[in-house]
Amino acid sequence: MLYDPQRHEPLGDVPWDERGARDWIARYAEHAQSTFSREHRWPTHPRDAGNDIGDTPCPMLYFGAAGVIWALDHLANARAIAPPDDFSQVVAELESRNTALTEPWGHGVNGLLMGNSGIRLLHYRQSVDRGAMDTAAAVADALAAGVAGNTGHPSLELLWGSPATMHAALTMHEWTGEARWADLFRADAHALWRAFVPADEAPCRLWTQDLWGRKQKMTGAGHGFAGNASALIRGRALLPADTWSAWADAIVETAHATALRDGPLANWVPEVPPAHTPPKMLVQWCHGAPGMVTSLAGLPDPRVDELLAAAAELTWAAGPLQKGAGLCHGTAGNGYALLKLFKRSGDPRWLERARAFAMHAMAQCDSMAAEHGQRRHSLWTGDPGVACYVWGCIAGDAALPNLDPER
């Protein structure tokens, strides 16, 4: 079987309610602002506390203050909520706090989701919005240095590595049009191609991730092939035509060669060869079919049409995740696969399914808040990411936070 039913739960039968969804987003935004403190920012949720952080309030995009502020700004810019409080002074402090927290972990400090590049993007945008152009220029220079310094990062994945800082360069290029960001993207793409080599374990190219003291060839969006491909697909217009053609062929080949099929369904093991027997059949954004869809849905190539549809069908058949509601390994992240296929195919059935996942994800958030006595203030694992997803279901917008074009 291509998924483990014990990791999933039945989809709720509450019908789509746009007014209720809008109210839920507004309530979360109000709660986030009312529970914020300058000293402690937002508390780390027990589900996010681990050996590296304990209950230390985190600064980064992934599950820290920068991510919550990013989500509030995003929702306000979409006019889903009223303009939030001014967090500019807080944002200016986050980089130093993040360096102090993450530098001892040994993965560098320049990553997008876990490192300082995501914080710098937020700081830059807020500085421009406030008209603080000298600050914005200094932050942009620091971001450019960080992107350049992250080239060749051994993790070769989205949380720490250069594929994610390629997304940062693309965002800055989309915002500013400056050539240096395109140059940084192309330099990283060149380095990625050199590392994307024919694998002994599969008839295709794969990257080898050097992370957590292990070397492994991972396939998913969070830590492997799919996530890396997403940056190249997003920035394909900045590459020479022959270079992009080679990339497109290789991406299509690897997606098919690593897929497991069962009739109309498709999924991927987290790594090649599988690390477990039997293999873990995960269905999450970070590992498995949902992240493959969100990462490759922007690939303008009919050779993946049927494969992506099969991956989305698997995501729908598996149902919501028991783990929770968030983006990385929760119901909302899986729902983005359905939204992406709606945007790619135009088939309204996928939007209906995405909205069903949205209703379930909101209920999961509320249930977890009641269980723990606090909201999960984390963009990629908690409520603000769900709020962004729910808004996407209202607006028909499939843009994934931090990894798709922003305003």
Which sequence ranges carry the predicted segments?
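Low-complexity, Ser/Thr/Pro/Gly-enriched N-terminal "stalk/linker" regions
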Residues: 1-65, 70-74, 78-92, 183-202
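Well-ordered alpha-helical scaffold segments within catalytic/enzyme domains
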Residues: 1-17, 66-81, 118-130, 166-178, ...
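Terminal, non-catalytic domain-edge segments
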Residues: 1-31, 234, 238, 298, ...
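Long, well-ordered core segments of solenoidal/helical folds
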Residues: 23-41, 85-105, 134-152, 184-204, ...
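Solvent-exposed loop and edge beta-strand segments that line ligand/cofactor-binding
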Residues: 43-65, 98-116, 148-162, 210-226, ...
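Extended ligand-binding groove/face enriched in aromatic
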Residues: 73, 80-220, 226
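Extended ligand-binding clefts on enzyme/binding-domain cores
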Residues: 180-305
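Loop/turn-rich, solvent-exposed surfaces of beta-rich toroidal or solenoidal domains
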Residues: 315-350, 357
